[in-house]
């Protein structure tokens, strides 16, 4: 039992030599993100006799609680659109296929969902219960541990979300400007300390490193795809620098949200991704066609919730699109942004009448009809 706990907490074999016979066969022991999946599976294994299927079901269950938390959060903002939002959060194929097995992505969907829910409860509803604060800390830690780059898209979008939500309640122009500048200052200082605190981890996801890695990955996967008839994609030549990478911003976003195209699919699983991408293309065209491009973006910029979805989706889509270069990997990496982008489309398409106004949301003490699964 003692050795099991030491393995669970990734004790160094220098401090605990008894773990060495076990970790010598685990090459992922020194990768905290990968090992966290195995550690969580080991805990679930206590409840299931270390049988894979029950462990996978537990992963799927907890992932669903996060997705459900996201769904209920947005339903309380747009109660008339509960059916349309259900499609966005609960029925996107990639989300429940890649977010319901023993994967890093499954844990991240759990954490991201509860991070959205608790952030909304704490900062908008002002519900500072111990449960919400603990869930917020846990979800933030899990995302940081397993896929910290999600935070690089989430934190800016969250800051804008909170800024626009709170500033909309201030009627005096001067006070609104002062509060906005104060918020930006505090957010900037907080982001600075965040980057300093996690400088080593964030360095792997700096723009310079991403640019260099993207160029290397592009060349390698292009070679492999040519030799093995693989599912790689190419965004074209670009200089491995920040400026060169930014020039591929539109292509990277498009490949994440709207590709592969049907003629690019060489495998059944890629064809399914292509069909899903066609659905995204269709609803995107319909949403902007119905209201017009100018009115659609005006609606996005005026609604803090839509603006959050837009910023997070676009930043995240760019990050994974510029660095994956393989449709198979991309279909898994992109799932955190899909519900937010599609929910934005649903609101643009079907929000006709007034929903809950922001003051009602802020004063709301409890999200109705939501039953926590944990």
Regions found by a protein language model. Name each.
Residues 128-133, 167-184:
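Membrane-interfacial entry segments at the cytosolic side of transmembrane helices
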Residues 41-43, 55-77, 282:
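Transmembrane-helix motifs of polytopic, lipid-linked glycan transferases
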Residues 101-106:
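Short acidic/glycine- and proline-prone juxtamembrane loop motifs at membrane-interface regions
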Residues 15-58, 258-265:
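Juxtamembrane segments of multi-pass membrane glycosylation machinery
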Residues 96-97, 131-154:
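Membrane-interface alpha helices of multi-pass inner-membrane proteins
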Residues 66-69, 252, 256-261, 272-299:
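Hydrophobic, aromatic-rich transmembrane alpha-helices
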Residues 53, 70-91:
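Transmembrane-helix signature of polytopic, membrane-embedded enzymes
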Residues 76, 125-131, 285-311:
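Membrane-interface helix-loop-helix junctions at transmembrane boundaries of multi-pass membrane enzymes
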